[in-house]
């Protein structure tokens, strides 16, 4: 019985210490400045979209990744030392960009309540790239990103809650493939490290 009382006192003492430490930490934390106001769902999604589209922060955005590429460079596919397509980098920057445009346009359509057709296979979202339309493709990529950002900006809160995970996933998808574009450009020798990635 005496052991139980000692355990209760130790437990109570630990709770008091925990509460005291928590209050002390909170009291020492400065109030956020106006630029550090808490994020809303909308502002967090817009920040994600911009960081993968046109705002260099943690990584190189897609607009920078495709800037300055010629149509000829955009169709280049890495080959291994035997002259075969490298299985670790089997897409050109153009194919990767076409894939990004396809899926971002698909997501935009769904956000607008449309029912865009899904591809028969994901391969066709890469393989339908035509180097003759490279400049148009780069413009479409920029425009679809602006359109998605505008939709998120104006969307009612209840609808935004329904599409939030899709918007977050397309941002992650964009960052992933932008990294691949940079990898291919580095292999090709067409990437300028001054643009963000050494």
Show where each model-derived region lies.
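N-terminal secretory signal peptides that target proteins for export/translocation
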Residues: 1-8
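Short, contiguous alpha-helical
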Residues: 38-40, 46-66, 74-123, 158-198
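Boundary of Sec targeting at the N-terminus
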Residues: 27-28
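Bacterial N-terminal signal peptides
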Residues: 12-24
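Acidic/histidine-rich alpha-helical segments that form the ligand environment
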Residues: 125-158, 168
